[in-house]
């Protein structure tokens, strides 16, 4: 049996750090961002739909101009919804195929690293969900420092995602990432013990 652990959080909460720690332990990661990049780079049907919807200039020599596309959809809910309608079904199909392969190979634990896990309803295909949490003021401070953003711009980015507190309340496992790296590692160890207990893995 394969246990699928969904991993999500908010921007600048430390989800990527947790994902890297899991990968270092040899746990396979299905990375939603990587899958999305592969779909944009390699799927000609998706590229054609992006050109038809947003303009021919967004695909040059078989490559999507991701920076231009990002600028176009950021802060524009209608454009973002159009892009998601084009890409989300293909991304989901790719992720589901990877999950089927993991099951076929009897991989005991696979992590689905998905920034929009709840927004796109992947919790329905996960056996458990881990949320990396920060109170919004700490999240804001980290994002402003990391990306050199104004408070207003950082808040816009945070508010473009679903409420982190809501995600935390829905999760099976929560890491509160306000402390040190060692504290983060200790919490992750506890989560993995909980996953082993729930899944029957030793």
Swiss-Prot record:
GO terms for biological process: coenzyme A biosynthetic process. Its EC number is 2.7.1.24. Disulfide bonds: none annotated. Keywords: ATP-binding, Coenzyme A biosynthesis, Cytoplasm, Kinase, Nucleotide-binding, Transferase. Residues 4-202 form the DPCK domain. Pathway: Cofactor biosynthesis; coenzyme A biosynthesis; CoA from (R)-pantothenate: step 5/5. It is found in: Cytoplasm. Catalyzes the phosphorylation of the 3'-hydroxyl group of dephosphocoenzyme A to form coenzyme A. HAMAP family: Dephospho_CoA_kinase. Belongs to the CoaE family. This is Dephospho-CoA kinase. The gene is coaE.
